[in-house]
Structure formats: C-alpha cells, structure tokens
Amino acid sequence: MICAVYKSRRKADSYLFVEKRNEFERVPEALLEMFGPPELVMMLPLMKRDHLGFADIEKVKSELADKGFYLQLPPPVVNLLEEHKREIGYSRD
C-alpha cells in the first residue's frame, strides 16, 4: 500500500494521509476547510515500514482502509516550567 502524505499550510505539524494522490473524496469537507490547501510532501510505501515518526503505523493503515484518510496532529505543547513545579511540589498557597 502506497499513500500520499500532505502537510497543512494552516496548521503547523499537521499531516493528512490519503489512499491515492489528489484523491480527497472520502475526506470530510469540514476537515479539508480547516486543513487548508494540502501540500504534497511525499508518496509513502506503508508495506515496507514497521513504524512511522509520531503515528502508529497500524492505526494509519486501519484508518486509510476504513475511512480513506488519516489525520496526524502535533502532540500537545508541554509547559516544562509547570511540569517541573509539579514535580518538586511547588505551590503558591
């Protein structure tokens, strides 16, 4: 299975995987509107891979088969200062 990977020009680090290049028929219109004009990044052979960067490859394959697309969003931003305060038990009270 080879899929096309597009990046969003509106949402940083957001990627849309579709079954075939330039085929967005199965992608909801609202998602395409939010995503903005897709920019092709690469054609990706999934069968030759056992992992991807941030995405679970089995989930990507499953979503492509079931829905015709997979949306990869960036991980949430971690506030390292707040995390450190919590770890050391700091409280303003």
Curated annotation (Swiss-Prot):
Q: Where is the YcgL domain?
A: 1-85
InterPro entries, from UniProt? YcgL-like_sf, YcgL_dom
Where does the signal sequence lie? Answer: none
Spell out the PROSITE patterns in the cross-references.
YCGL
Q: Which Gene3D superfamilies match?
A: YcgL domain
Instruction: Tell me the Pfam families matching this sequence.
Output: YcgL
Q: Which domain of life is it from?
A: Bacteria
Give each disulfide bond as a residue pair: none
Q: Which PANTHER family match?
A: PROTEIN YCGL (PTHR38109:SF1)
This protein is called what? Answer: YcgL domain-containing protein Swoo_2115
Origin species, per record, is Shewanella woodyi (strain ATCC 51908 / MS32)
